[in-house]
C-alpha cells in the first residue's frame, strides 16, 4: 500500500536510471519521478511545490555521509525528514564493448569501487551522476570510456554490462531520506527514529555533555557525524540519529540537548526503515 497516496511527483538528484530514482520508485511506485541536476535544485523544487517530496541520499555504508544533503537539511527551513529507505547499491562497469581505460561516475561511486579500478589500472573520472555518466558514455563515442552505474542505466542508455557487482563491499547500501514540506514530528506512537543536528557550546567537554543527554536515558545512537561550522574556526556541527524505544525518554533527551547545545535543529521523527 502506498504510504503517501497524495504525493504524485517525487524528486531526486540525478538523471533517469540513477540509484536515487530507483529508491524513489521503491518508496512511491505510483508517483512520477523528477530528476534534478543538483541537490540544491531538488530542495528548491520542494520549496516551490514543483514536487511533493524528494528522496535524497544522506549516507552510504562505504562512502560515509553525503555532506551536501546534510548541510541543506540544516540550512533550509520548512522541510522535514518524514521517512527513510535503505537501498542496496550494486555497481556495474558499463561500456560499448571495447576495453575501458577511463571510468566516469559520481565521486561516491568511484570511491566505492576503488579496489576494482586500481586492480585494473582504470582511471577514475568524476561525473555529476552515475546515470549521467552512462548517458555521456553512450552519447560521447570516446574510445576507452566506460561508466560505473546501475544495470538499469545500462538498459536505458543501450550500454553493455562489462562487469557486475564491482563495489568493494557486497553489503554496500545507501540510506535515503524522504524529505517533504512541514514541521518535523515529535516522538510518538509508530515513530521509531529521530534525525537531528546540533552545535555544541564552545567550551571544554561540550560534546561529551551533549551526548550524555542520550546515554543517561539509555538511548542508542545509530549515527554520529560532525562537520565544521562555516566562518567559525574549530566549531563543529554534529549530526545524530537515534532509535526510539521510549517516546518519553526521547522527548526528555531532546529537551536536555536544547539546554546543553548552542543550537539544535530537529530534522524529523519517522518510522525507521525495516
Feature-to-residue mapping (PLM):
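Domain-level signature for soluble enzymes in the chorismate/prephenate branch of the shikimate pathway
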Residues: 1-274
Amino acid at each position: 500500500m502506498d504510504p503517501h497516496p497524495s504525493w504524485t511527483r517525487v524528486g531526486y538528484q540525478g538523471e533517469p536510471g540513477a540509484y536515487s530514482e530507483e529508491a524513489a520508485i521503491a518508496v512511491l511506485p505510483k508517483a512520477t519521478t523528477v530528476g534534478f541536476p543538483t541537490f540544491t535544485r531538488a530542495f528548491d523544487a520542494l520549496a516551490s511545490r514543483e514536487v511533493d517530496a524528494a528522496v535524497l541520499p544522506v549516507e552510504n555504508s562505504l562512502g560515509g555521509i553525503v555532506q551536501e544533503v546534510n548541510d541543506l537539511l540544516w540550512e533550509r527551513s520548512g522541510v522535514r525528514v518524514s521517512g527513510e529507505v535503505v537501498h542496496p547499491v550494486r555497481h556495474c562497469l558499463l561500456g560499448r564493448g571495447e576495453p575501458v581505460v577511463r571510468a566516469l561516475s559520481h565521486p561516491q561511486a568511484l570511491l566505492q569501487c576503488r579496489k576494482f579500478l586500481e586492480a585494473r589500472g582504470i582511471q577514475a573520472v568524476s561525473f555529476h551522476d552515475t546515470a549521467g555518466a552512462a548517458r555521456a558514455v553512450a552519447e560521447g563515442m570516446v574510445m576507452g570510456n566506460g561508466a560505473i552505474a546501475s544495470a538499469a542505466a545500462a538498459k536505458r542508455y543501450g550500454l553493455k554490462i562489462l562487469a557486475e557487482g564491482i563495489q568493494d563491499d557486497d553489503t554496500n547500501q545507501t540510506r535515503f531520506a524522504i524529505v517533504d514540506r512541514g514541521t518535523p514530528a515529535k516522538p510518538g506512537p509508530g515513530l521509531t527514529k529521530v534525525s537531528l543536528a546540533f552545535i555544541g557550546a564552545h567550551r571544554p567537554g561540550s560534546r561529551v555533555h551533549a551526548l550524555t543527554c542520550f546515554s543517561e536515558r539509555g538511548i542508542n545512537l545509530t549515527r554520529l557525524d560532525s562537520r565544521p561550522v562555516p566562518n567559525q574556526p574549530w566549531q563543529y556541527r554534529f549530526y545524530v540519529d537515534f532509535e526510539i524505544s521510549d517516546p518519553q525518554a526521547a522527548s526528555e533527551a531532546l529537551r536536555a540537548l536544547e539546554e546543553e547545545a548552542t543550537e539544535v535543529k530537529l530534522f524529523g521523527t519517522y518510522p525507521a526503515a525495516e
